[in-house]
């Protein structure tokens, strides 16, 4: 059985989260030496690249020594509260990334509070210590106070701290002595973040996010909590209203590097993507057909944003845009509701 660590990264907008993940990916040698890549690999949605923010959570996976590390990128905004909560359900620990000058910000508090509530183990990374006027020691105190105010347990308050600069590709335990490697962070993840806790019993997996492909339709993503999921087998899909549907797993993928690898079976503790399951919603449980036991649903905060769609009355009306007819707009909006 391979050793797995599932970690989520929490950070305020612009504190360097996506850059840090980029450096981890490069350190684990996913790219060939001569391969071209864009910076901000994780922000692959157009809006995210334009604004430099993370809205949807993405999963990447790196292998370090003999451990598979699944990295789950979380949105840093309270506006995406539902997304945050679902994503943290897949993790066993979190990396809290904080700017060495700005310190913990209000939005960090929201996501960190959710993580501590779920009992996740934190590692604190104080980033950008190369900036002028940075104050790493004060920021460390501020993080401790924040966790204390959020009712962290004694174990959570004994968090491991690393200092560094993701941009300059280093992390270490002493910010006054920079080194030249980001690997101490991966060592800390393997050492301090617990392995997934695996319960005995029949298959259970909660769908915590989804992906969409024009070829195979909706893809269910989640972490296998108990048992295993096998390709080609039939399972029970437990819906919110108590209805249990029979579904068949057509294809099974695990995250490997920036992509996905097709596999025939996924064991408890790993995160996987399933195609072929029709009519699922986020929060549904894929369970054993003979003995379907649904997992508790995730309570999601109500959305904090209202939108109004009106007729375009700008001077460029009808002259630009990819989706211009009402049919196109309807299809595009409906596709968004499937996510």
Where are the model-predicted features located?
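Residue-level signature of catalytic and energy-coupling elements of molecular machines
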Residues: 14, 20, 52, 71-73, ...
């Amino acid at each position: 059985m391979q050793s797995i660590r599932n970690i989520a990264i929490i950070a305020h907008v612009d504190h360097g989260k996506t850059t840090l993940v980029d450096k981890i990916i490069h350190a684990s040698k996913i790219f060939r030496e001569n391969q071209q890549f864009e910076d901000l690999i994780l922000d692959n949605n157009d809006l995210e690249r334009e604004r430099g923010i993370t809205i949807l959570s993405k999963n990447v996976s790196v292998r370090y020594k003999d451990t598979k590390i699944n990295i789950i990128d979380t949105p840093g905004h309270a506006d995406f509260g539902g997304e945050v909560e679902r994503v943290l359900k897949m993790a066993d620990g979190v990396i809290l990334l904080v700017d060495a000058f700005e310190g913990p910000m209000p939005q960090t508090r929201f996501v960190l509070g959710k993580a501590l509530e779920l009992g996740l183990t934190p590692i604190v990374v104080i980033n950008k210590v190369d900036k002028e006027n940075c104050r790493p020691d004060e920021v460390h105190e501020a993080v401790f106070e924040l966790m204390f105010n959020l009712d962290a347990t004694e174990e959570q308050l004994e968090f491991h701290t690393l200092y560094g600069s993701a941009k300059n590709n280093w992390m270490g335990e002493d910010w006054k002595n920079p080194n030249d490697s980001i690997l101490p962070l991966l060592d800390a993840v393997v050492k301090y973040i617990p392995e997934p806790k695996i319960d005995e019993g029949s298959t259970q997996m909660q769908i915590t996010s989804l992906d969409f492909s024009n070829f195979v339709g909706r893809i269910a993503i989640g972490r296998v909590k108990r048992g295993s999921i096998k390709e080609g087998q039939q399972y029970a899909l437990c819906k919110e209203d108590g209805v249990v549907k029979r579904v068949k797993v057509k294809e099974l993928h695990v995250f490997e590097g920036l992509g996905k690898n097709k596999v025939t079976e996924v064991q408890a503790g790993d995160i996987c993507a399933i195609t072929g399951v029709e009519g699922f919603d986020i929060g549904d449980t894929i369970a054993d057909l003979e003995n379907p036991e649904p997992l508790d649903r995730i309570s999601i905060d109500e959305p904090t944003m209202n939108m109004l769609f009106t007729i375009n009355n700008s001077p460029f009306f009808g002259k630009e845009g990819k989706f211009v007819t009402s049919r196109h707009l309807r299809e595009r909006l409906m596709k968004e509701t499937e996510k």
